[in-house]
């Protein structure tokens, strides 16, 4: 545990406490208010735009200008936000911490959380200067900013909201293992690379919402043989609906790594099983039951919107070999999600899920694009979208087609 000052402004405490006591962050308005209150009394700039909701950023290749991103002391900045940090896990270059704060010192049951993602900039990759907006580490920040507008505009709740970002020195994170604050193999490898001078001296820090339900993969591994058809239907609808919303405004959007462990879950407090959420997807209404969980898309360091958000990783030779290109492909993310989901590495015994759910998945990803020369062993589709359009075996060519026409979602459409 990285201990930091827990004293934050009393007025700020009261505002956040009120949100938590009223049931948490189920409503979009509460999520937006939480971000405002969390940044009170700090000099951090919010990453979302509250006023000009459709304004993203100008064509500029400098991430520092695009996001008004400054270099700051890590400890003093987190102190201003409030609370302490708990180390959660590490990826190849990114490390996740959980911010924990008690707004009311007299009520320790009242706890708020936020996410802190620390990302190093590798030197060996041919991604250019650390200020280059097309570096994967920076493209992810821009993607979160542009996609957050869909939440701000009440078009979908299914995206993790960014709160703020800043740069800081890598040194503080190298010292954490020496002080036995973190003991983790991947983190040890990160420290070793730091000591071998494989990273730049600056790291990027992202403050974001915290999803308290973990990731979808862990949830499904534990519950896949217990979930009802209704619960499967809601989970799949949430994923497909947010893709449909994004692709309507940004047809070229590709997540490029949409698998269950890159999707987070938010628990919904005060669950009323009779609650029905009304979705409007491109002028089509859907009525979605409350199952106590809300998915949120996350991990966008592989994502791109050609012509809007370029990502250097997408232009690499190795990504071209797995059909990850800066080209529109509305079916790619759908295919990758369901192909990986049904592999033994994800759900141990896929045949134990309800037959109706299996049949739905087989309609979305038929055998012709799941095996053989059309797909890699790890589920990467090798066909361009123009080739998909010519294949009658693929009934649905986009996420919107699936929720609009497949019988699996009949119960969600108005009669």
What spans do the regions from the language model cover?
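ATP-binding glycine-rich phosphate-binding loop
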Residues: 52-111
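Core residues of folded domains in eukaryotic genome-function proteins
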Residues: 92-97, 110-114, 156-161, 202-206, ...
């Amino acid at each position: 545990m990285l201990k930091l000052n827990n004293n934050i402004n009393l007025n700020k405490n009261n505002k956040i406490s009120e949100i938590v006591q009223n049931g948490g962050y189920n409503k979009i308005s509460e999520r937006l208010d939480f971000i405002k209150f969390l940044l009170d009394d700090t000099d951090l700039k919010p990453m979302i735009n509250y006023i000009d909701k459709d304004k993203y950023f100008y064509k500029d290749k400098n991430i520092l200008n695009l996001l008004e991103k400054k270099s700051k002391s890590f400890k003093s900045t987190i102190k201003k936000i409030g609370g302490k940090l708990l180390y959660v896990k590490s990826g190849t270059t990114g490390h996740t911490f959980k911010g924990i704060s008690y707004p009311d010192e007299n009520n320790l049951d009242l706890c708020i959380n936020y996410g802190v993602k620390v990302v190093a900039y590798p030197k060996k990759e041919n991604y250019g200067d650390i200020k280059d907006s097309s570096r994967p580490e920076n493209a992810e920040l821009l993607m979160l900013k542009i996609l957050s507008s869909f939440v701000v505009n009440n078009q979908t709740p299914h995206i993790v909201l960014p709160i703020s970002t800043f740069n800081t020195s890598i040194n503080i994170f190298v010292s954490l293992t020496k002080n036995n604050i973190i003991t983790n193999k991947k983190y040890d490898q990160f420290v070793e690379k730091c000591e071998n001078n494989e990273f730049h001296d600056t790291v990027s820090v992202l403050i974001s919402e915290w999803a308290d339900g973990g990731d979808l993969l862990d949830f499904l591994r534990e519950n896949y043989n217990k979930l009802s058809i209704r619960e499967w239907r809601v989970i799949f609808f949430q994923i497909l609906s947010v893709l449909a919303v994004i692709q309507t405004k940004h047809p070229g959007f590709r997540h490029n790594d949409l698998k269950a462990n890159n999707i987070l879950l938010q628990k919904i407090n005060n669950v009323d099983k009779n609650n029905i959420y009304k979705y409007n997807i491109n002028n089509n209404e859907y009525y979605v039951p409350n199952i106590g969980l809300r998915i949120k898309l996350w991990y966008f360091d592989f994502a791109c919107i050609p012509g809007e958000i370029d990502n250097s990783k997408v232009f690499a030779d190795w990504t071209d070999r797995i059909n990850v290109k800066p080209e529109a492909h509305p079916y790619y993310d759908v295919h990758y999600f369901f192909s990986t989901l049904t592999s033994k590495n994800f759900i141990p015994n896929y045949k134990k899920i309800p037959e109706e759910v299996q049949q739905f998945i087989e309609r979305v990803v038929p055998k012709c694009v799941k095996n053989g020369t059309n797909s890699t062993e790890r589920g990467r589709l090798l066909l361009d979208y123009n080739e998909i359009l010519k294949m009658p075996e693929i009934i649905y060519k986009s996420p919107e087609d699936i929720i609009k026409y497949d019988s699996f979602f009949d119960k969600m459409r108005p009669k």
